[in-house]
Amino acid sequence: MGGEALTLPKDLLDFSGYGPKELQALLDLAERLKRERYRGEDLKGKVLALLFEKPSLRTRTTLEVAMVHLGGHAVYLDQKQVGIGEREPVRDVAKNLERFVEGIAARVFRHETVEALARHAKVPVVNALSDRAHPLQALADLLTLKEVFGGLAGLEVAWVGDGNNVLNSLLEVAPLAGLKVRVATPKGYEPDPGLLKRANAFFTHDPKEAALGAHALYTDVWTSMGQEAERAKRLRDFQGFQVNGELLKLLRPEGVFLHCLPAHYGEETTEEAVHGPRSRVFDQAENRLHTAKAVLLTLLK
């Protein structure tokens, strides 16, 4: 693909090493790829290893399809096959894969695993989700908001729910994109105070206070993969934090609903919200593809 070359850090584990210019350039590239429905041979002959400890619909599919659309291939390796950190040390997995492939996308339980992969592998490593961050999701979120509102600077985005990895990445990109984030979580489920401070985010334990007048209202599941033993307690603790039609009424008239999916209806949201007129949930899902293309095209080319 023609155009000015974009230089980014070797790995995308989170957004450290990114400034407003790098983030904007990546989003601009994703917009262009989407607009042109781009297909090319930029990554012809190149292979991406998908090293997944967790199951996935959007992340696996979009990364595989992105590689196909760019002329490359993806190889899927799940935990049963590899046993990363169990059957074989992370360092050894990294040193093997760097001999076979041009990049690694890792979906892991512990962020330390993806950090170790990046430290030991000479090829680029992309964090396809860890307990600390979900950068690919944050890029899709930003692209969706930009499409809806025409820009990002000054938008107020409310987060209602768990102070989890998706929120962490949103807080990371907020100051780079000029977003104003308003966060509401139950007591005991707050995000990293350092991230809140760096994002200059507003924090409350009241969902209505966070949602009032926002451009977008964002939520995620109350119980993430690996937290199943906490499910009953979480269901109790998160009562009152459901994003439903009543809470969505507090947004601006043009306000939209975001969810990274999968959705657990009757818990953090409702079927009516996800499939309602304010929802941009499936635009977010589609934009996972275009932003994945932008990342892979930049890091692997």
UniProtKB/Swiss-Prot annotation:
**Which pathway?**
Amino-acid biosynthesis; L-arginine biosynthesis; L-arginine from L-ornithine and carbamoyl phosphate: step 1/3
Membrane-crossing ranges are none
User: What does the pH dependence annotation say?
Assistant: Optimum pH is dependent on ornithine concentration with an optimum at pH 8 for ornithine concentrations around KM values. Higher concentrations shift the optimum towards lower pH. At pH 7.0, the maximum velocity remains constant even when the ornithine concentration is very high (> 10 mM). At more alkaline pH, however, substrate inhibition is observed above 0.25 mM ornithine.
Highest taxon of the lineage: Bacteria
Write out the GO cellular component annotations. cytoplasm
Q: Where in the cell is it found?
A: Cytoplasm
The UniProt keyword set, sorted, is:
Amino-acid biosynthesis, Arginine biosynthesis, Cytoplasm, Transferase
Q: Which InterPro entries match?
A: Asp/Orn_carbamoyltranf_P-bd (IPR006132), Asp/Orn_carbamoylTrfase (IPR006130), Asp/Orn_carbamoylTrfase_sf (IPR036901), Asp_carbamoyltransf_Asp/Orn-bd (IPR006131), Orn/put_carbamltrans (IPR002292), OTCase_ArgI (IPR024904)
GO molecular function, one example?
amino acid binding
Report residues binding carbamoyl phosphate: 107, 134-137, 260-261, 288
For the protein in the UniProt heading, the enzyme class is transferase
Q: Does the keyword rRNA processing apply?
A: no
A Pfam family matched by this chain, by name? OTCace
Q: What does this protein do?
A: Reversibly catalyzes the transfer of the carbamoyl group from carbamoyl phosphate (CP) to the N(epsilon) atom of ornithine (ORN) to produce L-citrulline, which is a substrate for argininosuccinate synthetase, the enzyme involved in the final step in arginine biosynthesis.
Q: Known PANTHER family for this protein? A: ORNITHINE CARBAMOYLTRANSFERASE, MITOCHONDRIAL, ORNITHINE TRANSCARBAMYLASE, MITOCHONDRIAL
Q: Which family does it belong to?
A: Belongs to the aspartate/ornithine carbamoyltransferase superfamily. OTCase family.
What name has this protein been given in UniProt? Ornithine carbamoyltransferase
* Organism per entry: Thermus thermophilus (strain ATCC BAA-163 / DSM 7039 / HB27)
The gene name reads: argF
